[in-house]
Amino acid sequence: MSSAKPLRLPPNFTEDRFSEFISRAGNLCGHENIRIVSSAEELVDGDYMNPCKAHDMHAIYDRDFFVASAVICPRDVPNVQGIVRLANEFCMPIWPYSAGRNTGYGGSAPRVSGSIALDLGTHMNKVLDVNIDGAFALVEPGVTFMQLHDYLEENNLRDHLWLDVPDLGGGSIIGNAVERGVGYTPYGDHWMMHCGLEIILPNGELIRTGMGALPEPGADKSLRPDEQKGNRCWQLFNYGFGPYNDGIFTQSSLGIIVKMGIWLMPNPGGYQAYMITFPRDDDLSAIQMVLQNVPTLRHILLDAAVAGNKASYTDKNGPLNDQEIDAIAKKLDLGRWNFYGAVYGPEPVRNVLLDVIKKSFLAIPGAKFWLPEDRSEPYSVLHTRAKTLQGIPSLDELRWVSWMPNGAHLFFSPITKISGKDANLQYEITKRRCAEAGLDFIGTFTIGMRDMHHIVCIVFNREDPVQRQNARWLIRTLIRDCAEHGWGEYRTHIALMDQIAATYSFNDNAQMKLNETIKNALDPNGILAPGKNGIWPQSYSKSEWELGEEETLIKKPSL
């Protein structure tokens, strides 16, 4: 079979060798399940529900800077195993993803351009099991939060079980969990709520972790291993026996997860969402943030961007000043900071919890308490959060990306302790740097069990090369700023993985040395997602593949 010439060949490949790989991959998966990316004109960004599959729809460099040579859509587990074994034979880098969204962190783009994008979600997208008594589901990579929620609704299971969802419901449950993404109910730590994995290792071997390693008595051994019924406790007890391996398969390049168990939240018997608005930036240090679920504290411009784009509020191009931000808050009847949370349980329990919350928060001068029925404006964030906080997915949060024309975004996600003082310091640093870059600060604090995720939404015009460069300058500068304060990021864009990995440098980079040792032991040919989270296999020269950290800030006269 002859194949088209790819826009970017994999490292150390000739066109003939690439064509041979594609031909043999087509024999494994079906030639109809392979698409070669042969020209820049094919790099159409699409949209969230129809994402591009070979590059980043929110590119911070040119679209073809991080781009796959081809996209392969395996039909089942044996297809994935076959592609992995073939990749070892050819030393072909492959970049697996579930749904390919991962917006703000690189989308479906590979870290090594020319890699084969392995699109698991197109065909491998089944809800394999939902168990009421055990309160869990077993899913394939392509199952999205929307899909599992719809499954619960269609099978009349919502009275028994709730799903925890992130801001946008179109993402893969497996993809979000293994990147350690979060939602907003008491089950908001998605990786914490996983239980049991089925994984294809870099040599093509299939394993099940935890209790899944114990065969189920009576399982039909005539079936393929991936088709055999799992142990009845596979989704009930995470650890099994011996070393607990699951964690090394998160944010890593050590295996391809093809099945995952996820715990679902038993219906709590009642629920109430609420919002509390705070009028001043200074209130940030006074807000107490240890509560029942995973609440969020959102800056006014994040909520304003949901309600309308920047041009609907001002004709100013540069970052808004305090007076302009306060005018927007007044127009929307919101605070400078807006806190969204929920309480769960029967009504008497909810009432007690709400009384405690009101007593604590309303002691801050000017703070106001709102229930969803108190708000009637279009695109009410409280109405959206009232769905999200009870596990009903939505797409409403897509609206804030349109704050700028040709809107794109890049997430900066440092971790800190739950402290008003720390939150205020992080906010002051990030707000100042955003202003220097000519961009508005748009962000939120997401409160976990012991920590806060500070999600800074760097929104820029993707068609403006200056804004793209300034966004890169901004986030690289923030990485350095935060490391100097002992704050590290928990997740990042593919372009920044090397820089952030280098900040985790305790004891002469001992953790990275361990990661590289494990990588080279399990993946000696370095075929699986080379460079993922800064971990480069021995077959790549790390110094040649790392991206430089220096970016030049470009000042526009209009800014």
Language model features with spans:
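FAD-binding subdomain of flavoenzyme oxidoreductases
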Residues: 127-130, 139-291, 557-558
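Flexible loop/turn segments at secondary-structure boundaries
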Residues: 43, 79-80, 102-106, 145-147, ...
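C-terminal cap/substrate-recognition region of VAO/PCMH-type FAD-linked oxidoreductases
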Residues: 245, 261-262, 270-283, 287-389
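Conserved oxyanion/phosphate-binding beta-strand-loop segments in alpha/beta enzyme cores
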Residues: 24-59
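Short, flexible, solvent-exposed loop/turn segments with mixed acidic/basic and small polar residues
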Residues: 56-63, 124-130, 260-269, 324-333, ...
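Glycine-/small-residue-rich beta-strand-loop submotif within the FAD-binding core of flavoenzymes
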Residues: 54-64, 108-144, 183-186, 264-265
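General beta-strand structural signal in soluble alpha/beta enzymes
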Residues: 34-39, 73, 94-98, 118-120, ...
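Conserved glycine-rich FAD pyrophosphate-binding loop
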Residues: 2-16, 20-23, 31, 60-70, ...
